[in-house]
Curated annotation (Swiss-Prot):
<comment type="function">
    <text>Catalyzes carboxymethyl transfer from carboxy-S-adenosyl-L-methionine (Cx-SAM) to 5-hydroxyuridine (ho5U) to form 5-carboxymethoxyuridine (cmo5U) at position 34 in tRNAs.</text>
</comment>
<dbReference type="GO" id="GO:0008168">
    <property type="term" value="F:methyltransferase activity"/>
</dbReference>
<dbReference type="Pfam" id="PF08003">
    <property type="entry name" value="Methyltransf_9"/>
</dbReference>
<comment type="similarity">
    <text>Belongs to the class I-like SAM-binding methyltransferase superfamily. CmoB family.</text>
</comment>
<keyword id="KW-0808">Transferase</keyword>
<feature type="binding site">
    <location>
        <position position="316"/>
    </location>
    <ligand>
        <name>carboxy-S-adenosyl-L-methionine</name>
    </ligand>
</feature>
<feature type="binding site">
    <location>
        <begin position="182"/>
        <end position="183"/>
    </location>
    <ligand>
        <name>carboxy-S-adenosyl-L-methionine</name>
    </ligand>
</feature>
<comment type="subunit">
    <text>Homotetramer.</text>
</comment>
<feature type="binding site">
    <location>
        <position position="201"/>
    </location>
    <ligand>
        <name>carboxy-S-adenosyl-L-methionine</name>
    </ligand>
</feature>
<feature type="binding site">
    <location>
        <position position="93"/>
    </location>
    <ligand>
        <name>carboxy-S-adenosyl-L-methionine</name>
    </ligand>
</feature>
<feature type="binding site">
    <location>
        <position position="197"/>
    </location>
    <ligand>
        <name>carboxy-S-adenosyl-L-methionine</name>
    </ligand>
</feature>
<dbReference type="GO" id="GO:0016765">
    <property type="term" value="F:transferase activity, transferring alkyl or aryl (other than methyl) groups"/>
</dbReference>
<feature type="binding site">
    <location>
        <position position="112"/>
    </location>
    <ligand>
        <name>carboxy-S-adenosyl-L-methionine</name>
    </ligand>
</feature>
<dbReference type="InterPro" id="IPR027555">
    <property type="entry name" value="Mo5U34_MeTrfas-like"/>
</dbReference>
<feature type="binding site">
    <location>
        <begin position="154"/>
        <end position="156"/>
    </location>
    <ligand>
        <name>carboxy-S-adenosyl-L-methionine</name>
    </ligand>
</feature>
<protein>
    <recommendedName>
        <fullName>tRNA U34 carboxymethyltransferase</fullName>
        <ecNumber>2.5.1.-</ecNumber>
    </recommendedName>
</protein>
<feature type="binding site">
    <location>
        <position position="132"/>
    </location>
    <ligand>
        <name>carboxy-S-adenosyl-L-methionine</name>
    </ligand>
</feature>
Length: 323
């Protein structure tokens, strides 16, 4: 089943710094649509098509992500929207407010944004890339800072569907999600700002990943990196065994000093740690929109300073640097 989302993106970038992407990206997306679709993809697209057309009178992106008022839809339509959106569970990153419907996601991603946003350069009129964007919560907040265009990259097709479900209620032409990894993006030094939050520790080759992020930035552009870290000096890096906090796909957890050293070795400038925060069970928890296990189940029940495997509990750093 072909979808129109990407053709709209190609039109938007034709006269932009991203125009060189048109040499490769349409072919990659076409191959993806032919060969790599999730088994539920067509079902999900049909569900998206059932979302009712509404006319939100108010769009709020600066303080939260909210599309429309409860008073603009009737009770039947509200139940219809809830029923359809719940077909895309689990909802991990948010929260979203759609015509009075509170999508209470596993993560309070708004808390992370509050830790990040004060420390970054203005996004006004900037081309912004969010690598590992999930369902796009932070992309909407970036748009709320008046970015010229926000592009997200995340290979998860469920996240793509969640993004398209929210975009249904605010079809803004300045925001797009591509179902690809950063390694598939053409390296054209086109972005003013690149974000990558919650991805580095999932990569087997973290320095290669940092280099890929750098290759998306224009000279002088800003990188905002948020990742799990451990305490220690510049020689401290934790590699967990089979799992870390029940996650299988976790590789390197450096200290902040080690991470800054990696970035300096790769040629990043003005590298600095701007925030350090322990993840709490209030920030990541099970909800009606993500009703399976969450952080409290992944920590030592007798000592929340440790994971269930005995490693240091999640500690997240925000590092900012320029190309």
């Amino acid at each position: 089943m072909s979808v129109p989302w990407f053709n709209q993106f190609y039109k938007e970038i034709a006269d932009s710094p991203l125009s060189a992407w048109l040499e490769l990206l349409p072919g990659q997306i076409s191959t993806w649509q032919k060969e790599q679709l999730h088994g539920d993809f067509n079902k999900w697209v049909k569900l998206l098509g059932k979302l009712p057309q509404t006319h939100p009178s108010e769009i709020e992106l600066k303080e939260r992500v909210e599309f429309g008022l409860q008073s603009e839809i009737n009770e039947y339509t509200q139940k219809q929207i809830i029923g359809l959106l719940k077909q895309f569970m689990p909802w991990r990153k948010g929260p979203f407010h759609i015509h009075g419907i509170h999508i209470d996601t596993e993560w309070r991603s708004d808390w992370k944004w509050e830790r990040v946003q004060p420390h970054i350069q203005s996004l006004e009129n900037r081309y912004v890339l969010d690598v590992g964007c999930g369902s796009g919560y932070h992309m909407w907040r970036m748009l709320g800072e008046n970015a010229k265009m926000v592009v997200g990259a995340d290979p998860s097709q469920l996240f793509l569907m969640q993004f398209q479900a929210t975009k249904h209620f605010n079809p803004d032409p300045r925001i797009h999600l591509l179902p690809v990894g950063v390694e598939q993006l053409p390296e054209k030094n086109a972005f003013d700002t690149v974000f990558s939050m919650g991805v580095l520790y999932h990569r087997k080759s973290p320095l290669d990943f940092l280099q890929q992020l750098k290759n998306q930035l224009r000279p002088g552009g800003e990188l905002i990196l948020e990742t799990l870290v451990v305490e220690g000096d510049e020689n401290t890096v934790l590699m967990a065994g089979d799992r870390y906090a029940q996650m299988r796909n976790v590789w390197f957890l450096p200290s902040t000093d080690a991470l800054c050293l990696w970035m300096k070795r790769l040629g990043f400038k003005n590298v600095r740690v701007v925030d350090l925060a322990k993840t709490t069970i209030e920030e990541q928890r099970a909800t009606q929109w993500m009703d399976s296990q969450s952080l409290v189940d992944f920590l030592d029940p007798n000592d929340h300073s440790k994971t269930i495997e005995g490693y240091p509990a999640p500690l997240r750093a925000v590092v900012v640097a320029e190309r």
